[in-house]
């Protein structure tokens, strides 16, 4: 369970210097928790110049019960790695066969994974005692506190993360007080950045790692990244048009930004110009490039009743003309 669902969260927050407001996600209820809900409809698409040819369509490459597909990245030989939120595992899946295996266990409700250009692999852990854990090259706790207090004291819940080439990690906290944008430097010391970003969610670096993009509801913010990893010059990068609010994001080789919106993927040019929308099914909440040539756009989809036995996840894929950034996993 995530930290906010744990009864012990009250004791943790009571000890914070400035206790944050309680955080929660409403439990949704499907028509029946005994019968699997129907899979979402996968719509056809219109062309986006240089990105997507007309008439392409999504296909399902993997599905499973529960809230168990989140924070995915490309992995070796065209495979996909993702976090199992409910099961507290990290899995690796081959889209060509649909076969998956557990590669890391006991992640304390791990909700997203990220691998930097230097090969370091991290997972964001959403359970009580929230943290950023390093998985490779050596498994160990990387960041567990902010200003001497548990990460829970910032409010909300850890959502997404982005490892950089320095050995640090940017991460988002949805529901944080004031701003949910954080950076854990290579020593694991955490700093908070930004103003007016309480709904921070998807977080991604540009290919040259000089710009950090963060979604906040229907707005995508951009930050300049300094040489030491600190952030400056917060600004609005773009407004989403295709859905309900920004979530997991990706970049391609040309620096375009792809943002999951809840029912589509919105695409922006590097200067923030809106390029188009790739329609998808309801519940589309994350996207990334993968495949051996990184010309396949994958997306993760949640449907059914959140927090109920009817919850389902699936991974879908669509071929693109654009190529995902090849210099790192995502």
Report each predicted region and the residues it spans.
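Sequence-structural signature of mature extracellular/luminal beta-sheet repeat domains
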Residues: 1-330
